[in-house]
Structure formats: structure tokens, C-alpha cells
Amino acid sequence: MKRALISVSDKNGIVPFAEKLVELGVEIISTGGTKATFEQAGIPVTGIEDVTKFPEMLDGRVKTLHPAIHGGLLARRDTAEHMEAIAAHDIEPIDLVVVNLYPFQETIQKPGVTLEEAIENIDIGGPSMLRSAAKNYAAVTVVVDAADYDTVLTELKEHGATTFETRQRLAAKVFRHTAAYDAVIAEYLTKITGETFPEKVTFTYNRKQALRYGENPHQDAAFYTEPVALLNSISAAKQLHGKELSYNNIRDADAALKIANEFTEPVAVAVKHMNPCGVGVGENIEEAYLKAYEADETSIFGGIVALNKEVDAKTAEHMSKIFLEIIIAPSFSEEAFTILAKKKNIRLLTVPFAGSVESLEKTSVNGGLLIQASDSFVEDSAGYEVVTEKQPTEAEMKALLAQWKIVKHVKSNAIVVGSDKQTLGIGAGQMNRIGSALIALEQAGEKAKGAVLASDAFFPMDDTVEAAAKAGITAIIQPGGSIKDKESIAMADKYGISMVLTHVRHFKH
């Protein structure tokens, strides 16, 4: 290895790396700020303009886009015609490229960043050099990650060159990196244009965690997050204590957080297998947790609990009495953390309940991807319609609105029975609506008397209304829209139940 081209925005570790290269007899070529850094460190360096015989121009937009650079990168060492061609133009081969790119992603995250600032942080020369070097990895070593500096130096010391396997691995890493870089730019500009579903989509994710296994032990898995994760998401969570999260933990935690984010008042959400098993609302977080626990004392065992307010000592004492996989909250008081951390394996996570919700949902199918707007539609209850003779009382309406927030997060067909403070029965995932209703009503038992019922979609027949009435339900909320709405309304009138139509469906598959 004779020549290295180094041009980096992130200069961490670059000086000792370059010093070692010089000790190994490698000539360093560099640009702008990187060159100045080397000169200050006393490292011999050749300026890029001395190689190209052309000055930087357009405020630095054009520096390395030159045949003297790309010819030296792309020439195949095993092809005589290539080597003769670069020799004829006094171009020397470049054996090592070390480049990291302008911080576009970091730039667009800054508050108040302008489009012009973002545009000026789109790197052109850097990706071009990386791609040229990576294409010719048979002869050229390319480094885009400082974590690979030591590997390259070790192989150079031991063999005088990097191995083919290392060059191939680093080239693949470069193409992933440049693809991800371009994807962030494409997504940023696409959002500015207002296109939601363009003809081509590009998304990039970073591996956050290797997982022991997936949904089942025979399935391999890893957890990837968006470059800029939403603040109130599992992707942005910080783990304070406990074992590593599993695949199922992450999915359940995501489901719990989505429900907790529906409420501004103190709420506790218990989830099993991505369905809520208990949701409680209270004047304080202790009351909210106790309501969630009482909603289903059996199913909460081994579950995930999300709370939207700080966990205090009293709440922690209650939670420490049962086995929970995960507790997620904005924060834990010092005393609460001490109480809960006595359990070695419990996972304690913090998530700031702030910021926006995911605007798009992505679901993979074999050979494709379904993308839809998230079910975060802000409903105006003023548009709801009472269609029965009996009007819901103020207390019933409060309960209906609370359960309506919850039912949309239950797998369809979904029925939720509850009050304004808690769920009392949840019927999820049945292939017919009456089946889900019977499960929810049976779970609620005697507590169904005086409670309300929420349905994520319309009633195809009046049997659910009749079952609800016989169990003691006093008010129902549902979208409406069935050709048999009149029959369901008549059944409600027969039993003196109030019914509210929202005209908004909340299927969840």
C-alpha cells in the first residue's frame, strides 16, 4: 500500500491513524480541513490540488471530482490497458480511501435549520470517492467507519496489505452507508415536496441491537431503528436496568406505548401479546396502575406495563409484588428505582412522552411493503351522533370516549367493556364480532352492569347489542355504517341503551 486519500468530517481518531500509515511508508493525500488537521499535527500530507493540478472551486463544492482522483481509484491493477491509460495521463493509483461524509442527518435535526443549510450539507465528492473505491475493492481498501481503523492497521502491519475478505466486507459497508445517506436526503426532500406515496420509496434503519432470537427461538432477529427515532417510541427508549430486550418485548412495549400516548391524564397500560389486558386511568399514577392491575389480575402477570407519568415509590411497591417483564415510564423516582431494581431481570425503560406520533405505518408482505397513514386521526367528538332514544349521561360519555381510545389498539374484531377509569373486559382477534363481545362481557362479569362497550367496527347484526344489554351495558360507541344499523339501534332502544356513532372505523389487523 503506497497512497491513501483521507477526507473526513468526523476527525476523531484520524490523526493517530494517519501517523501509523506514515510510519508504514504510506503517502497521505488530503483535502481542506483534514489537510489542515494533519499539518497541525506535523503529519506529511499532499494537498488534493497538487494531485489534480486544479484548485478547489465553488466554495469547496468541487474538490475531488477529477480524473486524477477517480482514475487512480477505478483503474484495475490486473488490466494492462487500465494501467497504461492512467500512466499516459500521469495518474498514480490510490490504494486506500478514508472518507466520512458531511453531517446531513445531524444538520436537519437542528432546530430552525434552513433548506439552504441542509442542501450545503449534501456531500457529493465524498460518496463519489467511496463508491469508486468500493467498486474496485479487488485492489482498493475503503474505510467509512472509524471502528475499522484498527483492523486496517493490523493487517497492514502483519501482511503489508489488507486481505481480500476485509476489502470486500468494507466495500459492502460503504455501499450500505452511501445508500443510507442518500435515503435520508431523499426522505427529507420528499417530505418538503409533500409527497406521501411517491413512485419509489427509500427508508434507512440502523441496527440498534442484535437479538437472541425472534418471535420464536428458531428465528434469528435484530432490532433496527430510524436514524432519528420518535421521542415517544420504543426506538428511543433508554434501558436503565434488567436483561436485554427480546423481540417480543420490543413489539409488546411498542403496543403499550401507543395506547399510553392516547392519554394526557395519568394512565397505566398492561399488554400481553400486543393486545392490552388492562388499562387504568387515575388522578395519579398509583391509582392508574391499580386500576390497570384490577382490570385483569391474571393476564397482567408476565406482561409489559407502560405509564405516562413518573413512577413513584408507592406505585413501585405495588408493581414489585408481581412478575412483570418490562416497566416503561418517563422517569422513575430514586426510591422507586431502588425498589424495582431489586428484581435482577425486570427491564426498566424510560421514554420521554413528548413529540409527534409516527405518521406512516409500514407492514411487510412477501415481496412487498404496505404503507399507510397511521391511525392517529384526531377525531372531533362534536361530529359523533347519538342515534338512540336514550342520550348518554355525562359520565357515560366520558367512559365511552375513554374506551374508544383503547379499542382502536385491540386486534380486530375488537370489543372493549369498561368505565371512565378502566377496562373491564377485552375481546380481541375473533373472526366474528359477537365472539369478541362474549369474551369481553364474560371477562367483565358482574362489573359489566352499568359499564359501557366500544366496538372498533360496525355491528353486522344486532346480536352484540342484545348480548351487551343482557349483561348490563348502558351505553355503546361504534362507527356505524352497517346495512343493519337500524336493527342494532332498535335493539338498543328496546333495552334502553344509548348508542353513539363515530363514523370512524378502527380496524387493526
From Swiss-Prot:
Alphabetized InterPro entries for the sequence: AICAR_Tfase_dup_dom_sf, Cytidine_deaminase-like, MGS-like_dom, MGS-like_dom_sf, PurH-like
GO molecular-function term, one example from the UniProt record: IMP cyclohydrolase activity
Q: Residue ranges of the MGS-like domain?
A: 1-144
GO aspect biological process, one term: 'de novo' IMP biosynthetic process
Keyword check for Cell membrane, yes or no.
no
Q: Which pathway?
A: Purine metabolism; IMP biosynthesis via de novo pathway; 5-formamido-1-(5-phospho-D-ribosyl)imidazole-4-carboxamide from 5-amino-1-(5-phospho-D-ribosyl)imidazole-4-carboxamide (10-formyl THF route): step 1/1; Purine metabolism; IMP biosynthesis via de novo pathway; IMP from 5-formamido-1-(5-phospho-D-ribosyl)imidazole-4-carboxamide: step 1/1
The record's catalysed reaction(s) read: (6R)-10-formyltetrahydrofolate + 5-amino-1-(5-phospho-beta-D-ribosyl)imidazole-4-carboxamide = 5-formamido-1-(5-phospho-D-ribosyl)imidazole-4-carboxamide + (6S)-5,6,7,8-tetrahydrofolate; IMP + H2O = 5-formamido-1-(5-phospho-D-ribosyl)imidazole-4-carboxamide
Q: What is its EC number?
A: 2.1.2.3, 3.5.4.10
- Which Gene Ontology CC terms are recorded? cytosol
Q: Lipid metabolism: present as a keyword of the record?
A: no
Pfam families registered for this protein in UniProt: AICARFT_IMPCHas, MGS
UniProt keyword annotations, A-Z: Hydrolase, Multifunctional enzyme, Purine biosynthesis, Transferase
PANTHER family given in the database record:
BIFUNCTIONAL PURINE BIOSYNTHESIS PROTEIN ATIC, BIFUNCTIONAL PURINE BIOSYNTHESIS PROTEIN PURH
The similarity comment for this entry is: Belongs to the PurH family.
| Domain writeup | The IMP cyclohydrolase activity resides in the N-terminal region.
Q: Which protein are we looking at?
A: Bifunctional purine biosynthesis protein PurH
Q: What is the lineage of its organism?
A: Bacteria, Bacillati, Bacillota, Bacilli, Bacillales
